[in-house]
């Protein structure tokens, strides 16, 4: 299960890699069963 703490850590890593998320225009994280647990969509 992905809780808010894990989501915050993912966001921190993404911001460290690219503060504008420009390289993560559409990112999906799936669990072992293939269920989407986290998705970023950048419409810019």
Curated annotation (Swiss-Prot):
Its EC number is 1.12.99.-. This is F420-non-reducing hydrogenase vhu subunit U. Keywords: Metal-binding, Nickel, Oxidoreductase, Selenocysteine. It comes from the Archaea. Residues 27-44 form a propeptide. SUPFAM superfamilies: HydB/Nqo4-like. Its cofactor is Ni(2+). GO terms for molecular function: metal ion binding; oxidoreductase activity. Belongs to the [NiFe]/[NiFeSe] hydrogenase large subunit family. The F420-non-reducing hydrogenase vhu is composed of four subunits; VhuA, VhuD, VhuG and VhuU. The large subunit of Vhu is split into VhuA and VhuU. Each contributes two ligands to the [NiFeSe] center. NCBIfam families: VhuU (NF041786). Ni(2+) binds at residues 20, 23.
């Amino acid at each position: 299960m992905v809780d808010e703490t894990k989501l915050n850590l993912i966001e921190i890593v993404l911001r460290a890699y690219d503060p504008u998320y420009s390289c993560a225009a559409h990112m999906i994280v799936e669990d072992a069963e293939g269920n989407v647990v986290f998705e970023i969509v950048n419409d810019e």
